[in-house]
A protein has these predicted regions:
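Protein kinase glycine-rich loop
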Residues: 1-3
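ATP/Mg2+ or Mg2+-diphosphate-binding catalytic cores
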Residues: 23, 125-129, 135-136, 230-245
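A cross-family kinase active-site recognition segment
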Residues: 82-136, 156-158
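Active-site activation/catalytic loop segments of kinase-like enzymes and analogous catalytic loops
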Residues: 190-216, 225-243
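Conserved short submotifs of the Hanks-type protein kinase catalytic core
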Residues: 68-80
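Active-site acidic catalytic loop and adjacent metal/ATP-binding pocket
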Residues: 6-13, 17-20, 56, 148-194
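A conserved alpha-helical element in kinase catalytic cores
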Residues: 21-68, 85-97
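A short, glycine/Asx- and small/polar-enriched loop/turn
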Residues: 5-6, 12-15, 66-71, 225
Length: 245
């Protein structure tokens, strides 16, 4: 096992193959296969054009599969430094490269899915399991709806996005940061990905560059939407750790 979090990550040693098995995400989403299928399709394209990504496995078909009821996909092992998280500036450069490559992706991806359908699923699960109250759920939904409208008005651009682009979803390699974990990929404005990246490490120079490209109002709206979007997931992760799921 490499990691057990939202998904179980397993190295099929000695083969250079990594399996990503939907565990917590399957519990919340009920059917994780569409997420995994979108991820494999997008990353297959990105690997083909040389973008900085962990590529699908070239030893076994990438899938996704369902094995004994578990949804999973297969990926190439990337030699990296597991103790190092890429710095925000290096990750920003790699994300720019990724966005340039994703503009050519010919497939269809749902608009801002992490904050739309996936938010609804996570919030419904949190409400069903009493991790949020009905009042909290209504408040979060109202805030989400208003911020979606605001971001749609301020940033109408639409292209393929990573969807969950904080620096821990990249690894440090000899070529620099390489991005992985695209199961939240979606379409929308690039400011969504950029806001996620700098929210935890708001380096002034990078924030200024994002404001120059997209405007401060769009960055603020994307940041506020991200904060609302992850709240149900934070509650779910906290419960998992406390209860040992």
């Amino acid at each position: 096992m490499v990691r057990d979090g939202s998904n179980l990550i397993v190295h099929l040693a000695p083969a250079p193959v990594i399996l990503r098995i939907a565990t917590l995400t399957a519990r919340v989403r009920h059917d994780p296969l569409p997420y995994l299928a979108r991820e494999v399709a997008l990353v297959s394209y990105l690997a083909g054009v040389g973008a900085p990504v962990m590529a699908p496995s070239d030893l076994v078909p990438a899938g996704p599969y369902v094995v004994d009821g578990w949804a999973l996909s297969a990926w190439q092992l990337v030699e990296h430094q597991p103790e190092r998280v890429p710095g925000v500036r290096a990750a920003f450069t790699a994300l720019d490269e990724l966005h340039a490559a994703m503009r050519g992706f010919p497939g269809e991806l749902p608009w801002l899915n992490p904050a739309v359908d996936d938010f609804d699923r996570a919030l419904a699960y949190a409400l069903e399991t009493q991790l949020v109250s009905a009042t909290e759920a209504a408040d979060l939904t109202g805030r989400r709806d208003g911020l979606l409208d605001e971001l749609r008005r301020l940033a109408p651009e639409r292209q393929a996005l990573h969807g969950d682009s904080f620096a821990r979803n990249a690894v440090e390699t000899a070529r620099g940061p390489v991005w992985l974990d695209f199961e939240d990929c979606c379409s929308g404005p690039p400011v969504w990905d950029l806001a996620i990246l700098v929210r935890r490490d708001p380096e002034p120079g990078l924030v200024a560059e994002i404001e120059r490209r997209h405007g401060r109002p769009a960055l603020d709206a994307a940041t506020a939407l991200r904060i609302v979007q992850v709240e149900p997931w934070f509650r779910i992760h906290e419960a998992r750790l406390e209860q040992g799921w």
